[in-house]
């Protein structure tokens, strides 16, 4: 967990039976200034943190037994201005960081042995104003960035070397102060939380080009000031953290159209100012990441 105000990262072990969290020995671990976004590679070997106050990315190796974090050689690695969210592709080969202050996206290749980051050719790549949330589709073919200040979503084709190329028609509209962005497990739909209009925009993804087309009926109502968006590993449900109303909206996803319908009992209570949100698949009582 990235602790924005204390410039460090908290790490926990998870009880397989109760789900309770216990701090890892040595936690919290030092990071840069104002750490915000955090991501772990698909194999659970490395962790990366975007430090929005020091314009860099901290990288750590994860001890498989204890969960202890150890900075990798060369960490922290330079980023753009005010890096916010970051994501790692499903192959674990590349990482992408949305730089809010410099209106671009930093792309890195990940050394499979050391975890070190190296900028891919041409990085950083231009985005809209105030890029915030970033997502990679499960096939690692496309990257999507929510541009909060320009009210649109940038879409990129990912080349084999990690280089990003804007897809035809990018950026795509239909959003208002977009923050969080998520893609479903089969790369068919994308969802964006609109902080400025209290709703969620839904798009179909062209499997060949990566272009976005608004789903019929989009945007769909949410709570007040929606931020984080997540789709469960089955692709049947979507969830939105509403910062202003202190709750979580849950939706069923129409598998054919991508349309969102609130689930029974939605919204569900949360703490004050919920922001990030994530889901996992439960296997024999344990939370597991989606299969690669």
Predicted feature descriptions by range:
Residues 1-292:
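Predominantly soluble domains enriched in secretory-pathway, periplasmic, or organellar proteins
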């Amino acid at each position: 967990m990235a602790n924005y105000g204390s410039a460090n990262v908290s790490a926990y072990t998870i009880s397989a039976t109760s789900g309770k969290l216990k701090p890892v020995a040595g936690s919290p671990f030092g990071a840069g200034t104002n750490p915000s976004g955090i991501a772990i590679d698909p194999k659970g070997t490395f962790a990366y943190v975007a430090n929005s106050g020091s314009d860099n990315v901290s990288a750590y190796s994860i001890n498989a037994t204890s969960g202890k974090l150890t900075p990798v050689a060369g960490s922290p690695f330079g980023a753009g201005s005010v890096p916010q969210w970051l994501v790692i592709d499903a192959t674990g080969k590349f990482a992408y960081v949305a730089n809010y202050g410099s209106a671009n996206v930093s792309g890195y290749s990940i050394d499979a042995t050391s975890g070190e980051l190296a900028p891919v050719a041409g990085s950083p790549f231009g985005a809209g104003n105030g890029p915030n949330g970033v997502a990679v589709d499960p096939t690692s073919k496309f990257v999507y960035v929510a541009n909060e200040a320009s009210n649109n979503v940038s879409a990129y084709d990912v080349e084999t070397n990690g280089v990003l190329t804007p897809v035809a028609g990018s950026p795509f509209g239909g959003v208002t102060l977009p923050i969080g962005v998520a893609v479903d497990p089969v790369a068919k739909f994308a969802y964006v939380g609109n902080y400025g209009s209290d709703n969620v925009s839904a798009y179909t993804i062209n499997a060949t080009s990566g272009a976005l087309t608004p789903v019929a009926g989009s945007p769909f109502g949410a709570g007040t000031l929606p931020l984080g968006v997540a789709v469960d590993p089955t692709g049947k449900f979507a969830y939105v953290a509403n910062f202003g109303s202190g709750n979580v909206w849950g939706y069923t996803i129409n598998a054919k159209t991508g349309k969102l319908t609130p689930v029974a009992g939605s919204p569900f209570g949360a703490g004050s100012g919920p922001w990030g949100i994530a889901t996992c698949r439960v296997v024999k009582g344990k939370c597991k990441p989606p299969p690669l």
